[in-house]
Amino acid sequence: MATISRKTILALAIAAASSAHAAPAPSQINVSGSTRIEVATGNFTSMTLTGTANRNAGEDGIDFDGPQISGNFVNDANFNLSGNNVDAIGIEDDSADGAIGGSFINNGTINANGYNASGINIADTVIGQSGVTDDAIGNVVNNGTINVTDTSGIAPVDEQAAIMLENVQLSGDVINKGTISVQARNASGIKVDGQDQDPTDTVKYATIDRDVVNTGTISVTGQNARGIELNMVNFGQDVENGGTINVNGAGAVAVRMDRSDYNRILNTGTIRAVGANSIGIESRESFGNNAVSQGIINNGTIAADGVGIKVTNDLLQTGPGETSNASNFYRITQNAGVISGGDAAIDGNGQTILHLNGGTIIGDIEGIRDAFVNGNVAIYSGLIEANKLDVTAGKLYVAEVTNVTGDMFVRNGAGLSLFVNNSTDPSKAIVEVDGKLTLEQGSVIGVTTNPGQFTKESTKYVLVSADQLENLGAQVKTLTPLLAVTNVAFENNSVTANIGLATGSQAGEGLANAGVDRNGVAATKAFIDSVLAKLPVNSNLYQTFINANDAELRQLARQLQPETNRAAQSASLAATGLTNSAIGSRASSLGANSGDALIETGAWVKVLHGNSDQGERGGIAGYDADSTGLIIGADGKLNEQTTLGLALSHVRTDVSSDTGNDTDVATTLLTAYGAWEQGPYSVIGSLSYGQSDNESKRYIAGERAKGDYDSNVLAADLSAGYTIKLNENLDLIPTLASRYAKVQIDSFTEKGTQAALRTGSQSLEVFDVGGGFKLEGVYGDFKPSARLMAFHDFAQDSADTTSAYALGGATFATTGAPATKWTYEAGVGLDWTKGNYTIGASYDYTRKADFNADTMTLKARYDF
């Protein structure tokens, strides 16, 4: 590649002139230096700019006079400019129109500061190749950063923009993937202008054959700021914004189509206009395609202090009764996201068909021929100015008092959903229809609440009124189980109903329909009658519940319930299980078979750690539990066959429920145990009694209910085995075992929230019978062991609970998680004995349906 470094203007001119008599060559120009570079008309296969241009005040970056480039024009250079009327890259037509056969691509950083300063200015240039279909050519692309600042406050005499395209012919796209920032009056981020220098000239001189796409960021600040503007452009394609366009200033417009027809304006990003009379998207005397999936489409955010989307077309007559150009209308489609405007969300100029398929509209809707609701749409609009509003499918959520100027239809299966709160005037219709309102059979008028205080007393509201009402079989009902709708009447061209806080019995069916489980329905019904009806309307609990949607209500209903997942009971059972496992392994090593015939009396200590995970079972949320404990014991031989012992254990268990609740349980157990052996037969048993101190914390709507209560546990364990010697070192012991445990929890009353519960006493029994195999070996000083057992619970007890709210009211019952029939256990251990000392470690694994637990034990023993 031929590199053109910093040359004089004359040298560049000579080089360009001589190229007319030689084959075009690729050119690379290093733009570094303090004065501008001028490139005369010439032929090039491509053009690349490199370096960093730190120019003197008033000096441009680089100017081209009608370059003829068969390939791409790529800027990899950086420009820092200051002074009046400067631009970084200029392509003019002083001697000839320019031509770029490929694309113009900016990868650099441009900083231009001064009155009427600009970034890139391309005029009277053909970019691309007519009739050639190639996405890589014909484009103007910004991948870099362009900053333009003009603090003079004086309107520019020439067009001012970060990227200015005047009278250009593009066979491709205009694409911004980078960052554009402009601070100036009457300036644009990207502007394509097809008007000649004579402002009265109505001929379009600019053409874009493909799309205008922004996936980057465009920010323009100043009076009459423009984000993207197409003025008198032969276009007919798409403007797509998947990035961010922000404009700020009086009269600012984020996206403006001025006498430039288009196929579609699609927003999936953010378009925001701040300032008096600002506009998000403006279509001025520019027609869009009105076919399905065309026109102006929003899937993102369009917000303006003035008007979100504005249509202006003085070329059409839109007065009352006007029928000329009846087919020339605009199509606006709201699929998702938000369209909002301080003056109006949408102004269709009487020429627009509006399709509302989803999302939210904030602000008045004006100038609409026909509006169709085809999905779930929320509107915060005082005015819907439309000849016809047709709710064909889904639900139209009306969040404030709204006037519909034309006729309105609510079709079969569709709904009109109205929000009420204390600011709603009961005597004034929430939706007032100036024309005829038709409610088809199967249509629904729903009532719900929006954030704000709502009185508990049943009050008569005017839901809908019309100049003429035709009810063909509409249903009026509540959309939240916490409200009751009664005394519905269709009279005097109005729909009225009494609305108030529902009683528990009234709310039951709605709670179930909202997906609240059986326990949640019981707890919520009691809460409504016993607590909610007594709360001030401005309390946290009241506001949280009354304004909850279905998903939030399901969560709140779970929070209201007492713990029904057996977590507290399981914590006490875990303490007995850990203790009995430790004592069982100790007792099994006492007899003659173990090779410890000389042992008469000894003391031992074991350190325990276990963790368990209970998954959801029977629709009841699970929990995780971590246990740590210490056991101290002593035992001795009563005779050659019998050994008796006593142990004291203390186990702490922290339970974290999947609902977010916590329970801490501290259990102290006293255990008597013994072992008997006669030949190959052995029997091991234990009896334990203990007490637990329980501290529970439940969380309801961000408030904590704390409980402090006691429980006691009784447990017994008995097993019998028959020893089969596999060899001189290893024994196999088939084993039968049974175990029983009962946990009794005292009644208690929570504190800390008005949703606190008074919970009755509870009990839970487990009776396991099972069998399995044990392996015990002696290899010198080492004694390995292993076991595999299976148990069946014949008690099948569940943790059912009877509770009432501490504020009073009737009790309600909740059903606990169902018991597990089968339990499977496996364990391994290893002891090492030297003289009178023994140390060892063991690991046990427990598996049930939706449950698993791990236990690790370290032990030490001294024999007297």
What are these regions (language model features)?
Residues 2-4, 8-10, 24-37, 450-630, ...:
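Outer-membrane translocation/initiation segment of Type V secreted surface proteins
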Residues 25-38, 54-66, 82-97, 113-133, ...:
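Extracellular beta-strand/beta-solenoid scaffold signature
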Residues 45-53, 71-80, 101-111, 137-149, ...:
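Right-handed parallel beta-helix
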Residues 104, 140, 174, 239, ...:
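Membrane-embedded beta-strands of outer-membrane beta-barrel proteins
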Residues 369-460, 467:
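Extracellular beta-strand/loop-rich repeat segments of large surface/secreted proteins
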Residues 535-728, 831, 842-861:
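Outer membrane beta-barrel translocator domains of Type V secretion systems
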Residues 617-625, 658-661, 693-710, 743-765, ...:
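Solvent-exposed, glycine/polar-rich loop segments of beta-barrel outer-membrane systems
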Residues 671-675, 726, 751, 758-864:
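Outer membrane beta-barrel transmembrane domains
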